[in-house]
Amino acid sequence: MKKLLPLIVSLALSGVTTAHADDLAQIYNQAKENDPQLLRSKADRDASFEAIASSRGTLLPQINLTAGYNITRNIDTHDNHQPSSAISENNNFTAGVDFSQELYRRDSWVNLDIAEQNARQQDSAYAAEQQNIILRVSQAYFGVLQAQDSLTFIRAEKKAVGRQLEQTKQRFDVGLSAITDVHDAQAQYDSVLADEIIGENNVTNSYEELREITGQMNKDLAQLDTKRFSANRPQTNSNALVDEAQQKNLSLLTARIAQDIAKSNISLANSGYTPSLTLDAGYQYSDVDDHTTRGNYKSNDYNVGVNLIVPLYQGGTTTADVKTAEYQYVSASQQLESTYRGVVKNVRAYYNNINASIGTIRAYEQSVISAKSALEATEAGYEVGTRTIVDVLDSTRRLYDANRQLSDARYNYILSVLQLKLAVGTLSEQDVLDINAGLKTASTSK
């Protein structure tokens, strides 16, 4: 009974692990809390909104309180360095209030507009990152499943080839096979062993890619339920999707705002030619106590005025700033055009990828059936001497290659759907839930 205990514990733990496998929705929630890219984008957005208040502050009154207390003591000395009776001392207390209000300063208003545009841009960039993390998490998640599936098929192939190797050795021992058959089977088995090492490493690395996003090491993931999996064509044609992307794609929106900011920077540079008008006022109180003359006097000073500054010549700086801003506007406009073309390309490409994936899945499903039948026929032919061991090994490899390709095609379809929605700008958390519903739960995995 003691010898069976470790096995029983192991099986119990295995059952618990399967029941508590993390699904896509759980991994996504972990990523939302821990992904550095998303958190950085959120911080940038929050900072940009605070910058609006900072820019608005320059348009509001500036009031400062000043105060000071000074003691001055003068001692006269004779030539023999002895102090004389001529000692003077006075205490001075001052306090004041300064007030300044911009009446007209164009660059302050333009800076406020730019700050608001920057906030809109960062808000759009954050929304884009919220969509992007859905795709990044899904790519990493299904990257793990894809690596695991590949390793599973490699190990199944290793088992099949190992069985064929043993049978070939037995046939050789009784004189039914040549030694070359044994060598061919051994070579194939060794090749599969190498594939297994690579597959195990790919699984480990795929988990690391997922950990990079979530900040956690997830050991077990819910698998795709292939029995309930279905691939459907997009309900909208590619031209309509391109039109929708022009309105909803967040990268395109961010690029449009960047162009608006560049245009505002031209206005900011031109404001260097405009005058500025400022209202300044102040009050100064002074209380001086002179102990030498035993005098004490107080003063109250008031001032108010309007200051006008007209820029006449700044050494060509303003002209250069305007030209720089104009070139930057051209650059932003070209970036917008580049982004637009990229969005159109991506929408059409991902749309085509979905349709291609559907055809590929159907073809690979038939390929698996055909490869299985071919292997059975080849093995039967080998038994009666009409086929060689090389034919059997090739048929075995084709069967498991077809299984791997079918598995890859399913994952490629899922990711193509997400990529299309990201390109259009409609990717949302609901898509995560929809995909999550197609994963195996604890009940469906039994």
What does each model-found stretch correspond to?
Residues 29-39, 46-61, 96-114, 124-131, ...:
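A glycine-/polar-enriched beta->alpha junction
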Residues 66-101, 224-235, 267, 280-321, ...:
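Small/polar, glycine/serine/threonine/aspartate-rich low-complexity segments that form flexible
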Residues 2-3, 132-244, 353, 357, ...:
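Periplasmic alpha-helical coiled-coil/stalk elements that build and connect Gram-negative outer-membrane
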Residues 40-55, 129, 133-153, 163, ...:
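Amphipathic alpha-helical coiled-coil segments
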Residues 1-20:
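Gram-negative bacterial Sec-dependent N-terminal signal peptides
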Residues 26, 92-96, 139, 184, ...:
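Transmembrane beta-barrel architecture of outer-membrane proteins
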Residues 8, 19-68, 74, 217-218, ...:
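Bacterial Sec-pathway N-terminal export signals of envelope proteins
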Residues 20, 405-446:
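Acidic, low-complexity, intrinsically disordered peripheral segments
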